[in-house]
Amino acid sequence: VTLSDNSRFVAKPVSHDPRTDLAIIKIDAGDRVLPVIQLGTSGDLMPGETVIAVGNAYGYEHTVTRGIISALHRTVQVSDVQYYHDLIQTDASINPGNSGGPLLNIDGELIGINVAVRVGAQGIGFALPVDKVLSIASDLCSLRRLESREHGITFTSLNNREQGLLVSSIEAGSAAQKAGLKPGDRIQRVESSNMQWPLELEMALLGQKAGQNIPLSVLRDGETLKLDLVLNASAPKATSVADRAWTQLGLRLQPLSASQLLDKKSKYRGGLTVTAVRPGSPA
């Protein structure tokens, strides 16, 4: 990973979503404090609004282009694997190398991630809304996905400019229920970290030891409560054969029964049909 001052770091992949081609990577910068982009919201965007796209178009670093939001809620299919819903359409110039770059509002806040451009057309580019990006990132960095553990909390919305995470439901028997959390609570802090996005909660809980008290500051009916969340030990990861075939080989497989093979006049009593192949995979 190369930063704007040309300092370089080796990145470690954490998690990846093949449907949107979004990935979480991690770098070790030591004691250095890295600048971060300010997050906006895509919940109040309007056609005609000015936007700014940043990227490495054709290898030209830090290319900045300006345009407007042309439309919202677009659907675009890039490949058999990548199928985007609810995209932002913009006429800001987006070229090869811009993919993965930020789409900003006039306040410099992140409102989307540039993901696609209409080949052969001018002024038609697409970005994944930041609220969707945060939802995907929260799942990619979740306790459930990375450590096979559950906190049992569901939140109402990602479109949240107020401090705190509004709890919509609590899973029965979960760590959250045992801690005393209830629907309607607003989680303001985990340990000493302020909470605004569910992704921040997942990041704060990752790596916490089993049985350790994790202090929460919770607002309930105008009163601030102090609760302790205790996570269980990691459960063994159970990965299905179908998931391994897709992630490692790039194959989607459908079992064939003996009767189906009989119709095909096959000498075998069972088998698999290839229903999809991931582009660029070993298959």
Predicted segments, located by residue:
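Serine-dependent protease modules
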Residues: V1-P183, R189-Q212, L219-T224, V230-S259, ...
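C-terminal soluble interaction/assembly domains
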Residues: Q260-K267, G271-A283
